[in-house]
Amino acid sequence: MIKQYLQVTKPGIIFGNLISVIGGFLLASKGVIDYPLFISTLLGVSLVVASGCVFNNYIDRDIDRIMERTKNRVLVKGLIDPKISLIYASILGIAGIVLLYAAANALAMQLAIIGFVVYVGVYSLYMKRKSVYGTLIGSLSGAAPPVIGYCAVTGQFDTGALILLLIFSLWQMPHSYAIAIFRFKDYQAANIPVLPVIKGISVAKNHIILYILAFMIATLMLAISGYAGYKYLVVAAAVSVWWLGMALSGYKTDNDRIWARKLFIFSIVAITSLSVMMSIDPHVPSEAFLTYVR
């Protein structure tokens, strides 16, 4: 039973989000780490993300039955009572929000609530099923964890937080489109209006290129604005150029599914590399680059 309650929280998604939280937190810490705050932030974000995933599993039960990759999820197979899952999700979410408020600050809590509402209330309940722009809306919630980590330290939404929001939002788009391409039949069968299904894979490839170019600019801005150092800059430039090259190769591929899967895998390598480098190579920016929103 414990295994099912763990699975419904999507541990893989929680782990991926924690890597970005660590990146944002350590970037803001500038080498001076408040360990109790660090642990509390990781736990708080984990609980909120877990809550969102459980709610998402509850909402998506009907379409999860249709899709090959989701047909064996806990709620689809009836291993947990749906009503119990709602209570479970609520407890997780409330615990995470309270912890962020008590151990971090009100801004971190507010960002967590906004990310949660966008993911569950806007994306999962409506946009995912009704609009080709659902991925764009979902990308905003996906970018919340690193910003929460950053603001847990700073207590303010400044230029650094804005750049992090841009980096992780822009990264989500080609990452998600790649999934939609190599899982094309799943999304088509479930009538989920993702861009590759609605506009075609060729159009999706064009969008992927544009988003990676924008992602590249955003990643470099973190160093140009003085928030990260030259080591970060070199890695950011390298992974962005490589990712762009992989995306461009999609115009010549004979197998879109294999190409998209490779692009998806490298997207994880890219964002993990950036999270690591911003963690170990932070800089203190000039005041000229700071825009405070307290």
UniProtKB/Swiss-Prot annotation:
Pathway: Porphyrin-containing compound metabolism; heme O biosynthesis; heme O from protoheme: step 1/1. It catalyses: heme b + (2E,6E)-farnesyl diphosphate + H2O = Fe(II)-heme o + diphosphate. Its main location: membrane. InterPro entries: Protohaem_IX_farnesylTrfase, UbiA_prenyltransferase, UbiA_prenylTrfase_CS, UbiA_sf. Its EC number is 2.5.1.141. One of its GO terms (cellular component) is plasma membrane. Keywords: Cell inner membrane, Cell membrane, Heme biosynthesis, Membrane, Transferase, Transmembrane, Transmembrane helix. The chain crosses the membrane at residues 13-33, 35-55, 84-104, 107-127, 132-152, 162-182, 208-228, 229-249, 264-284. One of its GO terms (molecular function) is protoheme IX farnesyltransferase activity. GO terms for biological process: heme O biosynthetic process. It is found in: Cell inner membrane. It is an enzyme of class 2 (transferase). Carbon 2 of the heme B porphyrin ring is defined according to the Fischer nomenclature. Converts heme B (protoheme IX) to heme O by substitution of the vinyl group on carbon 2 of heme B porphyrin ring with a hydroxyethyl farnesyl side group. This is Protoheme IX farnesyltransferase. The lineage of its organism: Bacteria, Pseudomonadati, Pseudomonadota, Gammaproteobacteria, Enterobacterales. The gene is cyoE.
